[in-house]
């Protein structure tokens, strides 16, 4: 199984500043010219919401403050600038190899 390791596990960012979350895969998630890495936001009592697909593509309706980058084994989610509504837990997920796996999550607090 591909193991996804997120860092940090939690972070506190001041309103209007930048938040950066990293995700490292135990092996490459690249195939056919794409990186099969995705980012989700989850708030308590709600299902995960897709933010970024294929490493860097913004899901429809998601603000451009969210961006993703990376390839092979190292990926980053950036939120810039952070807004109060961004307080949530963020997860990376790969679907390059079955079983599809998630990172352990990063809890974002807004100061």
UniProtKB/Swiss-Prot annotation:
Region (Framework-4): 102-111
Region feature Framework-3, mapped onto this chain: 61-92
Disulfide bond entries: 23-92
Remaining remarks: The ABPC22 and PC9241 sequences are identical.
Classification lineage: Eukaryota, Metazoa, Chordata, Craniata, Vertebrata
Cited SUPFAM superfamilies: Immunoglobulin (SSF48726)
Cellular component, GO annotation: immunoglobulin complex
Region (Framework-2): 39-53
Record-level GO BP terms: adaptive immune response; immune response
Region described as Complementarity-determining-3: spans on this chain: 93-101
Alphabetized CDD domains for the sequence: IgV_L_kappa
Organism (species): Mus musculus
Region (Complementarity-determining-2): 54-60
Name under which the protein is recorded: Ig kappa chain V-III region ABPC 22/PC 9245
Region: Complementarity-determining-1, residue numbers: 24-38
């Amino acid at each position: 199984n591909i193991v996804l390791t997120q860092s940090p596990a939690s972070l506190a960012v001041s309103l209007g500043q930048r938040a950066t979350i990293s995700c490292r895969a135990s092996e490459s998630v690249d195939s056919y010219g794409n990186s099969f890495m995705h980012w989700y936001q989850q708030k308590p009592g709600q299902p995960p919401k897709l933010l970024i697909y294929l490493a860097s593509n913004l899901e429809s309706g998601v603000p451009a403050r969210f961006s993703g980058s990376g390839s092979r084994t190292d990926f980053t989610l950036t939120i810039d600038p952070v807004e109060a509504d961004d307080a949530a837990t963020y997860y990376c997920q790969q679907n390059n190899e079955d079983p599809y796996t998630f990172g352990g999550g990063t809890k974002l607090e807004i100061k």
